[in-house]
Amino acid sequence: MTTRAETVRRAERHELTYGGRRRRFLLLRPEPGPRERPAPLVVDLHPSGLGPAAQLRGSGLGELAAHGYAVAAPQGALPYQGGWAWSLPGVPLAGEERIRDEAAGVDDVAFLAALLDTLDGMLPLDPARRHLSGFSGGARLASHAAVAFGDRLASVACVGGVRRPGGPGDAAPPLLAVHGLRDATNPYRGAADPRWDEPVPDAVARWAGAAGCAAEPVRTESAPGVTEFRHRDAAGREPVRLVAVASLGHAWPGTPDPLLGGHADGSGSDAYDASAAVRGFFGEFGGARAA
């Protein structure tokens, strides 16, 4: 069985010049095999302080290449704590009081749009099956991009970082949000911080409203300490979902990787497998099915 690290080592290294900067990204092409139509795409966004290889190892979403997906992982433009960070509209980086001067010329939402265009030129991709995922700062960027991109995305998955920018008339593609009740970096109940002022359930509820879903979610206990809130639409689907994990801090639950798994500080949890959930969600909303 191929390990996550081996999968990442197979990834192609590419560069894209955007906004006067050379931006790097990793690409895993769909593994050869019969397919009836162009491939679905996942763009996986790293957290602040890490990079694309660490994100793919932690999320395990590179494994989707074996199921017919193309998987791309770009790199943020701002150096941060030994890794990289994304420039998010109107807010400073975590732990910083003001927006960096160097961030003023970086529009990472526009960069992601340019990346989608670049990938469309490199591979036969299905424009109706584009998916965006991210952890922490990557999830916050995914939230902004999902609103800005309109119908360019089939779905989005945000682990430890969902936000709801924009208003009720803005785009709201299917959303899977996973968050820990013990998260001290991006607290579940919000914080006195312009970067993270809205409680997670409120952000998801506003997303559901924009998507035309019921305001009151269906609540289930899917496992001990794991509560799912699913907002249904008029067709009976559940395209907006929040998974709250009681034992989880600021980590990607279920990953064996210590960088995303919070093993060092004890904030991780094996109560929920976010990687499997994200793969299943993408398969449900436009992607090829992947176990």
Residue ranges and their predicted role:
Residues 170-175, 236-240:
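Short, proline-enriched alpha-helix->beta-strand connector loops that line the catalytic pocket
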Residues 33-82, 153, 165-166, 184-187:
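Short substrate-entry loop that stabilizes the transition state in hydrolases
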Residues 181-240, 248, 254-273:
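Active-site-adjacent alpha-helix of alpha/beta-hydrolase-fold enzymes
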Residues 82-101, 256-270:
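Acidic/histidine-rich helix-loop elements
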Residues 177-179:
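Short beta-strand/loop motif that positions the catalytic acidic residue
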Residues 93-123, 144:
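Alpha/beta-hydrolase active-site loop
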Residues 1-41, 53-54, 69, 104-109, ...:
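A domain-start/cap signature at the N-terminus of enzymes
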